[in-house]
Regions:
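Flexible "arm" and connector segments at domain edges
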Residues: 1-44, 49-103
């Protein structure tokens, strides 16, 4: 096996590990919700967010690009399910407001 093949295998393994971390994180969110402890829920959700940023970086999506995609997602038209959530709770509007204040 040459250096290039070895490097490619290493990158694939790393990518698979980060994807597994994301899946584990989603499972932790579900367990934390079932447990009802806010700090555990926040930690588990943070793990998912961080895993998304790390995965994006390894796939060539920079942190700023991901931030911009989130902004576009929040500012753009909502899907049917998202619109239903927005109509009932106003979550997307609240998140947009929060992100604007944070900038």
């Amino acid at each position: 096996m040459n250096v290039r093949e070895s490097d490619m295998i290493r990158k694939i393994r790393l990518l698979e590990w980060v994807k597994a971390e994301l899946a584990v994180g989603v499972g932790e969110v579900m367990r934390a919700i079932a447990g009802g402890v806010r700090s555990s829920m926040a930690d588990a959700m943070a793990r998912v967010v961080v895993s998304c940023y790390v995965l994006g970086r390894h796939l060539g999506v920079g942190y700023e690009e991901l931030d911009e995609a989130v902004s576009r997602r929040l500012e753009g038209p909502l899907g049917i399910e998202e619109q239903e959530i927005e109509d009932r709770c106003g979550d997307y509007r609240a998140l947009r407001r929060y992100r604007r204040l944070k900038e």
